[in-house]
Amino acid sequence: MYVVSTKQMLNNAQRGGYAVPAFNIHNLETMQVVVETAASMHAPVIIAGTPGTFTHAGTENLMALVSAMAKQYHHPLVIHLDHHTKFDDIAQKVRSGVRSVMIDASHLPFAQNISRVKEVVDFCHRFDVSVEAELGQLGGQEDDVQVNEADAFYTNPVQAREFAEATGIDSLAVAIGTAHGMYARAPALDFSRLENIRQWVNLPLVLHGASGLSTKDIQQTIKLGICKINVATELKNAFSQALKNYLTEHPEATDPRDYLQSAKSAMRDVVSKVIADCGCEGRA
């Protein structure tokens, strides 16, 4: 069909009581698996890329690929800037046709976070681009940004309302105990905090760091207002481990078209499970 923005997609999720998964892609194979699986399950999905991914693949190349695959599979897709921090970088990609942005200024003091985010919102809304921002900060690593667990902090529900009203954002990423990367042990999510945030903020809420969360935890966050679930590390790990296993078992393999099939199969299992956990099958 066409490349769309996240605003209507997440508003539909909020009304319908499900979440839309955002999968961070890193190469053609990741994109193929996400789109093919989503189309077969008739599920809305978001194609997310960090600054590193856009640098690796090229903005114009990614835009062309997403557009072509949306038409090929007759399936609405979103291409989303994940954890972008620089205004000029965001502006350039918006002018190239991107319609969904996450401006991450969560490392800044509250007032500066508002100022930085509002600048991006004011620009993006001129182009009908939806904007997500984060209040609170997750531990772990995303691209080249490393946040020590000791420096991570949770979203303040009262501040969340002020932040949403002052910036004009379309969705809010919250920090309730998740982290980027995989978990050494199951995280203790602060569900009461999430419920409180929901009472103060009527925007679609976003959960980053969902790789490795249990089905039960994911579905509980959705009941409490999460409308977008971000998954990155789980896909990378599935791809990498399957590829390592295949090449160990088949050291003579030299054709990427052959040995990448095992990696795609492993990722397909992850994507289908996340879609099922989010309750969005049949919602596209």
Curated annotation (Swiss-Prot):
GO molecular function (one): zinc ion binding
Cofactor annotation comment: Binds 1 zinc ion per subunit.
Reactions catalysed, as given in the entry: D-tagatofuranose 1,6-bisphosphate = D-glyceraldehyde 3-phosphate + dihydroxyacetone phosphate
List of residues binding Zn(2+): H83, H180, H208
Cystine bridges: none
Alphabetical GO biological process terms: D-tagatose 6-phosphate catabolic process; galactitol catabolic process
Enzyme class: lyase
Annotated binding of dihydroxyacetone phosphate, by residue: G181, G209, A210, S211, N230, V231, A232, T233
InterPro entries documented for this protein: Aldolase_TIM, Class_II_FBP_aldolase, FBA_II, TagBP_ald_KbaY/GatY, TagBP_aldolase_GatY
Entry annotated with the keyword Metal-binding: yes
Named cofactor requirement(s): Zn(2+)
Entry-linked PROSITE patterns: ALDOLASE_CLASS_II_1, ALDOLASE_CLASS_II_2
Active site: D82
Pfam families in alphabetical order: F_bP_aldolase
Pathway the protein takes part in: Carbohydrate metabolism; D-tagatose 6-phosphate degradation; D-glyceraldehyde 3-phosphate and glycerone phosphate from D-tagatose 6-phosphate: step 2/2
GO cellular component: cytosol
Keywords: Galactitol metabolism, Lyase, Metal-binding, Zinc
EC number assigned by the record: 4.1.2.40
Family: Belongs to the class II fructose-bisphosphate aldolase family. TagBP aldolase GatY subfamily.
Function according to Swiss-Prot or TrEMBL: Catalytic subunit of the tagatose-1,6-bisphosphate aldolase GatYZ, which catalyzes the reversible aldol condensation of dihydroxyacetone phosphate (DHAP or glycerone-phosphate) with glyceraldehyde 3-phosphate (G3P) to produce tagatose 1,6-bisphosphate (TBP). Requires GatZ subunit for full activity and stability. Is involved in the catabolism of galactitol.
Protein name as it appears in the record: D-tagatose-1,6-bisphosphate aldolase subunit GatY
Lineage of the organism: Bacteria, Pseudomonadati, Pseudomonadota, Gammaproteobacteria, Enterobacterales
Gene name of the encoded protein: gatY
